[in-house]
Every structure is written in C-alpha cells, then in structure tokens.
C-alpha cells in the first residue's frame, strides 16, 4: 500500500480507470487569441496582462525559496491591485506559492491566471519535469526527497492555469549540438497530439516529442488539455541572418514554432512564446536574401515605430497561432549595459514598460508579462560580475548591477525605513555618526545594504564651492597627492563635489577595476603589460564597460577581405561609461521630486551623498571585503578591512583624514518592500 502511495504521488505512475472519459479544454489557443471558457460554457478571448515572478528575496538565492506564504499572498494582492490578471513563473515553484495562489483565487472575486513554465536541457529532463509540474498544478504531488525535505503540493490550481511554456533561455550551443552532433535524436516525429513539420530541426523534433508527451500525460491522467508552447527569444528565433551579420550578432540557430504542428486531437492548441529584449536596430536589413523574399509581404509595410523596431509587428503577422511575450523589461539600476542606453529612473522605467505593453497589445499579441515582479539581488550583470564575491551577492544590493533593478517592487535597506534619505535633510544624522571634523566642516557617515552614506556640513558647503574628499579604502595602493593637495594617507578615491552637474568620484589608476578586467577588450592592449605603479599618483574616471551596438555593413567585409575579423573586432570593441559621475537629485521616495538615481543633494550648508558599494570597489560589503591589489593577485580577490579613511579640503594644503569604522552585517539582511514609481504607471494603464 505504501509503495502504491509513493508511486502515485511521487513518480507520476497511474492507471487510467476512465479511458473513455471525454477530455476537456477550458483554455484554448485559437487563431491569434487565447480563449477561456466562462461559466456559461462560452469561449471568450483572454488577453494576458501580467508579471514574471521568481522566488527571490534578499538574503537568499532564488533556489532557496526564501519567500513564504505570506509574502506570496501580499505580492499577489499588489499584482491584482495593479490591474494585472496573470502570473508567469518560468519554473516549478515551492508549495507555499501554489498554496498562496489557491488561497488568493478562492477568496477573491477576480482570480489570477497562471502561465507555468518548466526548464530542462534535453528530452529526458523536460519529460520528467513536465510530468512533475502537471501533477503539482493538480495538487497531486509529494516530493519525498527534495533538497528541503518533503514537499507537499496538494492545492489544485489547475482551473486557473492557462498553459505551459517549455524551456527557459535555450543555449544556442545546446541547440547546435542536438541539431548536428547528436545521432540519438530522431529527425522527424508523428505523435498523437503534435508532429514535426517537414524540414524541422532535430531540436524542434525533440520539442514536438516533449509537448506531445506532456499533453498525453495530462489528457489521460486528468482528462484535460491546455495550450502548450516553447520559449524563444531574438537570439534563437526563426529569423536567419546573412553570414556577415550573423557573425557579429552571434546568431547561428533558429527555432520556429510553426515547425511543430498540432493534430486534431490537440483541442487546446499551441502558442508561440518569446522573451523580448533589445537585439539590434534595422534587423530586417540583415536577413538572408531568401528569407527577405519569403517574408516580403510582411516586411513591406512593417510598423517600425514600436520599441523593438518592427519585431513585435513581424512576429504577430508571421505566426499562425497566438503570440505571448513571457518577459520584457527595463532596469532602474544605476548603471547601463549597452551604448546609447543611459540609466533609467523608476518613472522612466515605468514609461518604457507602459509603452511597450501597450504596443504589444495593439499589435495583436495574446499576452505580455513584465519581467520581473521584484528586484532580484542574486542576479549578476556581465560588466560587474567579476567585481564581487560570486557566493555572497544575495546579501547586499549592488546598485551598479543592471540586472538587479528590473522589478516593479524594490527591497529597501532597513527593516522599516531607509537609514538615510538623500534629500538635504539632516534628521537621520546625529553626533554618533560624526567621523571627521576639520576647519569648521564636519563629515558624518553611515552605511546600509546599498552603500556608504555621507553628510558634509559646515559653512561653505554649497554648490558654489568645490569640496575634495580623499577616501582610503585599501592599504595596498593609493596616492597621497592631487594637484596642490597633500593627503594624510595614500588614498584610492577622490570625491569631488563641484556643483549639481560636475560632481564625481575618481579612482586611483592602479585601483581601477574596469581597466584591469576590460581594457584589452576595449583597446586590444593587455593591461598586465602596462601595470600602473604601486603608488600611482593619477586619479582617473571610474568607467563601466558597455556593449557596442555597432553593426558593420556587409560591404565592408568584402572590402577588408581576409583582415576583416580583426578590423571588425576593432570597430566593435567594448565602449565605456563614466559611472563615477554623480546625479544630483532628491532620493526620498515620498517626495514629488523623487529621483531614484539620485546620488547626492545639497541642503542648507550641507550635502548628503550615497556612494554604492561597488563604486568603492567593495568585493563583499556584508563582511567588509574590498578588492585586493589586482596586479599582485592577477585579478579580483577580496581582503577584509575594519575601517576606511576620509578627509576633506576646500583649499590647497594638507588634508588630515579620520577612520570610518566598518563592521558589516554578515547574513543578517534587513529589508522592507517598496512599490516603485513604475508600478503605479503600469497600474494607470492596466486598471482602465
């Protein structure tokens, strides 16, 4: 008896005692729409407006499932109040999520819908996880040997599950291997519910088999079907670029939902799912001649006015099935990733999201999900990942990481309120925070999960005067001079407050993190062949590497001939962004003039400053580790410090410096939630 119980609830083993029972479909993919059968049995169109959610909270990795039942219930309430009607989860969640989803929907007049995703890398893993997921949404799954112990999935949320999305962001190399080097993969498939089209790739054949198996399993065990599709994105979509452009864009595989054909038995139908992000401007000009000819009727009057330069219109026209955007987003982080894309405030983030969501609907897509619901601290961005401890970045908020700022909800430092609000008000400061006093000017210091806060107070502290503040972070390098100033200690940074538009943080050239990591990719010169002196005296701008958006015309390839690879590499090198430039503004969310990117603000005879930890080369501020010497360690390694030093000068001469004690907070992460300005902008367009 126990063995049967285990097999039934844990291993997806079942006996079909109702082989002749009808299979129903409450949700269908019909034409270009998703429909939902109402209480009168009528299929009505359903336009999905939602957010992507993952179980991410500060102090935990996503797979730790740090969010609990109360968190999910609160978030679902916020999402419902925003005007959304759906949630997309890219993978199986924890029992608390499904219990919260069930509880919310059974106690609210307007339930939320769920688009459920699953991830896997091959046929076997996808087949297994899809069966598990199907049992979970029907409340018929117990995982006896999960990483967190036993997991009970007993809440039946299947009435609100719109469909399934197979896969995450597929690795193009995996697709290539399966298409060309995996002899075990069949090159065609004819199933009960799905078949592969003539000319389908082996990877598409694998997906047809997976989708067929999942539909068969739910049809036989639960007597229900629902739409199913697989995830794609601009790097792996069906578009084929001419070789010269494909090389630059690194686009060498294609996945086409049209190559997976539903049978008449698949009553629920299929859909195309895309994660949207900027890929390249004028992409239609880079297509192969054959594809340009095949798509000519679509391309002729393509609407290029939207956010993705015609991509939305192209996909809507091309596909014979509903199209859903499972994720699109814009970061409100302090630092960008690409040329010509400066950082966005929360308001600008909301305006970009609202504009894109509206355009997606106007072009006839069946749904759009904003990615993501909450900021995700454990995410790392390519141009800053090298600079922090890869095992502990969930314990602090890296304002310099764009990927951490995509949410509509922020996690703010402090259990209830921020320790410091950058607004020119001294209410959060007292003598306990005083760290330095010189020539009538006082420096106060505090820190949080986000960065170091300073208040400079005294006569002459105003936008008209220039203040120089040397900061000594590491004992391993630095300089004691700058122009006519002589610092008491070898300093690694120089904070120059020079009005509202020219204030900035400079770094000692030897301690410039981006130089040692990306200089070769920017200039072709290995920085370790041009090592700055140990006690380098030059301060330089703090830069951040950016991706180039330049696409070299195919004609240039022919002109350059055999040398094209190196020449093109030269033209497409990484660019740089002066991330040390500070933004003047009010950083108090309660202010009508709130600027989420604000770094400093002048008050009466004072200025408040926020310096993000990574801007000061902290490797892990939770335990107060800073970067060690790059050229002695051959890269970034952490070294603990118990204090850093700071001083101030208005005029030439010697600059005494005093310590700022540092203790860190370890794993004790205290945060509170805050709905961003972008949330309320989305609420305005979705609540109509």
Predicted feature residues:
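Glycoside hydrolase catalytic-domain groove-lining segments
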Residues: 243-244, 248-338
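Active-site groove signature of glycoside hydrolases
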Residues: 120-124, 132-201, 222-234
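Aromatic-lined substrate-binding rim segments of carbohydrate-active enzymes
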Residues: 69-138, 210-226
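Aromatic-rich peripheral "rim/lid" segments of glycoside hydrolase catalytic domains that contact
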Residues: 339, 344-348, 359-433, 675, ...
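Surface-exposed, glycine/proline- and aromatic-rich loop segments on solvent-exposed faces
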Residues: 434-568, 623, 627-651
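A solvent-exposed, charged loop/short amphipathic helix patch at secondary-structure junctions
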Residues: 125-128, 177-205, 286-301, 336-342
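Short, well-ordered beta-strand segments enriched in hydrophobic/aromatic residues
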Residues: 424, 451-459, 605-613
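Active-site-adjacent substrate/metal-binding segments within catalytic domains
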Residues: 14-107
């Amino acid at each position: 008896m126990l063995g049967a119980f285990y097999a039934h609830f844990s291993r997806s083993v079942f006996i079909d005692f109702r082989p002749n029972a009808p299979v129903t479909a409450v949700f269908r993919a019909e034409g270009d729409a998703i429909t939902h059968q109402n209480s009168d049995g009528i299929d009505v169109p359903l336009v999905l407006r939602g957010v992507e959610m993952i179980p991410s909270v500060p102090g935990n990795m996503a797979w730790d499932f740090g969010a609990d039942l109360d968190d999910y219930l609160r978030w679902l309430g916020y999402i419902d109040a925003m005007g959304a009607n759906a949630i997309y989860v890219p993978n199986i969640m924890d029992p608390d999520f499904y219990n919260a989803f069930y509880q919310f929907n059974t106690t609210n007049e307007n339930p939320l819908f769920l688009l459920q995703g699953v991830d896997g890398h091959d046929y076997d893993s996808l087949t297994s996880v899809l069966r598990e997921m199907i049992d979970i949404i029907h409340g018929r799954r117990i995982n006896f040997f999960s990483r967190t112990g036993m997991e009970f999935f007993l809440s039946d949320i299947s009435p609100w599950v719109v469909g399934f999305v197979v896969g995450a962001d597929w690795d193009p190399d995996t697709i290539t291997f399966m298409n060309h080097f995996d002899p075990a993969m069949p090159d065609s498939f004819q199933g009960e519910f799905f078949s592969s089209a003539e000319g389908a790739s082996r990877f598409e054949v694998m997906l047809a088999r997976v989708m067929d198996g999942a539909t068969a399993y739910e049809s036989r065990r639960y007597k229900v079907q629902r739409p199913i599709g697989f995830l794609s994105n601009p790097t792996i979509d069906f578009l084929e670029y001419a070789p010269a452009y494909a090389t630059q864009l690194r686009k060498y595989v294609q996945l086409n939902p049209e190559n997976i054909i539903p049978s008449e038995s698949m009553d629920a139908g299929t859909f195309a799912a895309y994660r949207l992000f900027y890929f390249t401007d004028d992409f239609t000009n880079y297509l192969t001649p054959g594809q340009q000819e095949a798509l000519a009727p679509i391309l002729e009057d393509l609407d290029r006015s939207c956010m993705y330069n015609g991509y939305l219109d192209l996909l809507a026209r091309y596909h014979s099935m509903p199209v859903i955007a499972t994720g699109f987003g814009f970061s409100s982080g302090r630092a960008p990733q690409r040329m010509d894309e400066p950082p966005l405030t929360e308001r600008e983030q909301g305006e970009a999201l609202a504009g894109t969501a509206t355009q997606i609907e106007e072009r006839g897509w069946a749904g759009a999900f904003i990615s993501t619901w909450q900021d995700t601290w454990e995410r790392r961005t390519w141009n800053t990942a090298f600079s922090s401890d890869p095992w502990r970045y969930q314990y602090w908020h890296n304002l310099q990481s764009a990927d951490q700022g995509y949410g509509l909800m922020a996690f703010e430092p402090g259990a209830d309120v921020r320790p410091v609000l950058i607004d020119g008000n001294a209410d959060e400061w007292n003598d306990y925070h005083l760290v330095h006093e010189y020539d009538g000017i006082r420096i106060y210091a505090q820190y949080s999960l986000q960065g170091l806060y300073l208040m400079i107070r005294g006569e002459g502290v105003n936008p008209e005067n220039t203040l120089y503040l040397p900061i000594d972070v590491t004992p391993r390098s630095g300089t004691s001079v700058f122009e006519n100033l002589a610092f008491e200690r070898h300093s690694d940074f120089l904070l120059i407050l020079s009005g509202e538009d020219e204030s900035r943080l400079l770094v000692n050239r030897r301690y410039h993190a981006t130089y040692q990591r990306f200089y070769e990719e920017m200039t072709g010169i290995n920085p370790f062949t041009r090592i700055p002196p140990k006690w380098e005296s030059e301060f330089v701008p703090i830069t951040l590497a950016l991706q180039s958006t330049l696409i070299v015309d195919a004609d240039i390839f022919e002109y350059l001939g055999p040398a094209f690879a190196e020449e093109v590499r030269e033209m497409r090198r990484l660019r740089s962004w002066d991330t040390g430039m500070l933004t003047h503004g009010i950083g108090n969310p309660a202010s009508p003039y709130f600027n989420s990117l604000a770094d400093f603000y002048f008050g009466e005879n004072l200025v408040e400053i926020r310096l993000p930890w990574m801007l000061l080369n902290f490797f892990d501020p939770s335990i107060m580790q800073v970067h060690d010497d790059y050229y002695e360690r051959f890269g970034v390694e952490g070294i603990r410090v118990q204090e850093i030093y700071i001083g101030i000068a208005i005029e030439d001469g010697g600059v005494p410096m005093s310590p700022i004690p540092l203790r860190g907070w370890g794993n004790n992460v205290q945060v509170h939630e805050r709905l961003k300005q972008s949330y309320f902008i989305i609420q305005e367009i979705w609540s109509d």
